[in-house]
């Protein structure tokens, strides 16, 4: 039958139709090749926004630096970074006046965190610039390398395991005249293969010691490596993002802890909460403005967009904010927090891999590394690249560009939100001292501004005043990209508000489907996504049931596990049919083993193995949940795992799902080819690190794990824990006397070995 599509909307309020405007099907664009060009763009743009500032030279590194602060006043319309310190400080003072005690309390909370945080906090996070190897590494490896180098240079405060002590080492390292590091390098040589008699290239990995003088070390410590941001929809041009090294990370973490604590106490802040909590918080602000404006006032809302938020922020402003926020605190605390902005004022941007050239005629390819851009002949480059390089040359030192102004993406989200909220806070009537007043929402660089006034002129005046106040602290509201509406309809951080936040279900569409981790995780993630959308995104029962059926179909096609009684022929159908025939209770077979689907919208919260356990044949149970099965490389699975799901817009979200370990929870093996490259030494370090951590977690399962207080090494902690556990097990009769004696003996041996070492 033909359906007239307009009939679908007869009963639907207009705002709920937003899901039908979904433009993002298909894969998002990814970047290929080098990010050098994008990084040069960022550096050049940032300097352009602050070009009227003062130039100085860093005495330690010789880097030229531009300081736009307290220089010329900003102009209308043109984005700029000319923030005025006294304006920022005044905004902070008013913020504190309207929220008595907010800074004091946040400082106390942060101080506690600073004293308790362990250095392993820095192992969280993905790619990190590893200054010892001058390239990106997984965070845990980069930290291990840094600590190893510190210790070999006589910096040992970090051995206490507290982050603050590691940071003491960082500070000391910057005063050293030289640092000795170990770098990996590879030798290639041509040898004849005995079997095939062909010439092959053999690679061997070496480690060599290298000394860095103070200047070279400082440059590396202040370097942010850059990459291209992937999977950004709705943009024609890619852009660069930064990954800081281990020296900067710890300091940034503490500053963000303080700022997060402040944001939690500010009703206008969209961070650090998310999801429904965020919607509730924001709806309150809107409700407040609408209730006050009902009788006499007009109320308008701007869906705001700021021009180049990061590139116009300035670390010097953040230093001023921190100095003010912590003004009554102990000296050591103020020092720890002011280091991050100081390092950012002196930061260097690494230009990435450089450029690739190829000659079609001679079939040659050659890489021009970023280090060579300072003095290579520019005739090889096209017009636009030539301009970029010419512009950036005065700033280059050792393949990195001096970048004093600007913040780089994603570094101080919380602190910059505090700055934004402080301007929203100035909109109260007692501060504007006139008929208009404003309030709003801020989340990093995204904002919504609600202005109330008795007439349109008042609204216009209010918007103008807000715009100019922002300018004074380096925030540039874009007049072109912001739009104004009667209050009640606006968008903020991809939430659409229309008399309440509208569920935009289509945003979640890309996360429906089979993730491709393994049969067990994929089934669990798939049903959890549907469950979560029923809870949070108005996914109705009928649609959910349909989504579930489509998911099961998709899953069966992905893993070629159609039901045992199907006619579809795949590579697996022969085995699955055989299993089907010899199984007594066919309902007990998992979908991935050709079984039927028992999920419906009522039982999505139950893992499939649990759902079918009572229905399974006994021998099938034994095969399915058999940790000794030799064909499965077994992941130890906690009861809850985390999956990364991609909404259409905004950052990848982490989603918890129930994980039951079965023989379907396999992990694909690591590609072997890595073992022949210079990564090999690093891979071995990483595996060792992993093994140690896994072992430690065996001794301290997360439920009983209290952060170790006092100073003891991992080994000492594990030995003492083993002794305690053994005694308890022995006294309760769980282990025999001989076993107890053996455990004690092993513990003593370990301690003896440590003493000898």
Swiss-Prot record:
Record region (Promoter-binding site): 249-256
A GO cellular component entry from the record: host cell nucleus
Modifications after synthesis and translation: Phosphorylated by host PRKCA.
Locations listed in the record: Host nucleus; Host cytoplasm
Nuclear localization signal (motif): residue ranges: 187-195, 203-216
Keyword Transferase annotated: yes
Entry coiled-coil feature ranges: none
Similarity comment: family membership: Belongs to the influenza viruses polymerase PB1 family.
Name of the protein: RNA-directed RNA polymerase catalytic subunit
